[in-house]
Amino acid sequence: MSALRPSTGTITRGTPTSADLLLQLRERQPLVQCITNAVVTGFTANVLLALGAAPAMTDVPTESGPFARIASGVLINLGTPHAEQREAAVEAAHAARDAGTPWVLDPVAVGALPVRTRLAHELVALSPTIVRGNASEIIALATGGAGGRGVDATDEVEAALDAASLLARTYGTVVAVSGAVDHITDGHRLVRVHTGDAWLTKVTGGGCALGAVMTAFASTDPDPLRAAVAATSGYTIAADIAAEGARGPGSFAVGLLDALDAVTPELVAQSERLS
C-alpha cells in the first residue's frame, strides 16, 4: 500500500510506549462500558478485570447514554444486536462523541447480515475512536461488500489494508484488522503486531475481548493508534504466555486470564514485536 508507511517499533519519538500505557491503565483502572454480545459478556468482563480495568455491562436504553458520558471508554460490539441493544448502542455512541469519551466499534459479521450491517454503517458515521474487526468485516464496512462467513473472516489481512485506510481517512478513526499478524492504521501510519497465538481463534470471545482491551487502553492515551497498538501487544503477548501451558482451548482460555493478570510492563517492553 503506497499510501501507508509502516512504522518502526517506536511510533513517535519521545512518546509513551506500550509498556508505559499498560502501567497507566493499571494505575487508573479505567471504567469500560461494554455494549457487547450475549455470547461473550462474561469472558469480556473477566478479561478487563484481569488486565486491571473495571467493566460495566450497561446496555439498556436511557441508561447507556448517561453512562457513556462518565465512563472512561465505551465498547460497542454488534455480535448479538437485539432491538433494545441496538437502541442503546446508538444512544451511547452519540453520548460518547458529545462527551469526548473514547469508544470502539466492533462490527461483528457486518456485510453478512442486514440488521447489523445497517447499524454498523450508522455507527461508523459517528467517527468511533477505533474500529476493530477481521479482514472481511473491515472490507464489508468500507465497501458495502458481503462480508465473511458469519463472524469468521474469509479474506486475508493484507487484502483489507486499502479498505482499512479508506475507513480511517473517511471517518477520522483508527482501524485495527485482526489476523495472524494484526495490522493497525490511521490512514497514514501503519503498524503490524507480530505477537499472538492461533488458540485465540478457538475461544469464543477471543477477538471480541480485544475490542474491550482497546477501549481500556484508548482511555490512557490521546493517540488512538498508539493505544490500539499497546492493547494488541499486551493482549497477544498474554496469549503467547497462555499458549505455552495450554493443553487445549479450555485451558488456554483460563490461562489467558491468568496471563493478562501477570503480564508486566517490563515483559511487554521485552516481548513486543512491531513492524
From Swiss-Prot:
What cofactor requirement does the entry state?
Mg(2+)
Q: Pfam families, alphabetically?
A: HK
User: Which positions does UniProt annotate for substrate binding?
Assistant: 57, 205
Q: Which InterPro entries match?
A: Hyethyz_kinase, Ribokinase-like
Q: Which CDD domains match?
A: THZ_kinase
The record's top EC class is: transferase
Q: Identify the residues that bind ATP.
A: 132, 178
GO aspect biological process, one term: thiamine diphosphate biosynthetic process
Membrane-spanning residues:
none
Gene3D superfamilies (UniProt xref): 3.40.1190.20
What Gene Ontology terms describe what this protein does at the molecular function level? ATP binding; hydroxyethylthiazole kinase activity; magnesium ion binding
Q: In which pathway does it act?
A: Cofactor biosynthesis; thiamine diphosphate biosynthesis; 4-methyl-5-(2-phosphoethyl)-thiazole from 5-(2-hydroxyethyl)-4-methylthiazole: step 1/1
Q: Does the keyword Transcription regulation apply?
A: no
Could you list this entry's UniProt keywords, alphabetically sorted.
ATP-binding, Kinase, Magnesium, Metal-binding, Nucleotide-binding, Thiamine biosynthesis, Transferase
- Catalytic activity annotation: 5-(2-hydroxyethyl)-4-methylthiazole + ATP = 4-methyl-5-(2-phosphooxyethyl)-thiazole + ADP + H(+)
Entry's EC annotation: 2.7.1.50
User: Which NCBIfam families does this chain map to?
Assistant: PRK09355.1 (NF006830), thiM (TIGR00694)
Similarity comment: family membership? Belongs to the Thz kinase family.
Q: What does this protein do?
A: Catalyzes the phosphorylation of the hydroxyl group of 4-methyl-5-beta-hydroxyethylthiazole (THZ).
Do you know which HAMAP family this protein is assigned to?
Thz_kinase
What's the protein here called?
A: Hydroxyethylthiazole kinase
Q: Which organism is it from?
A: Clavibacter sepedonicus
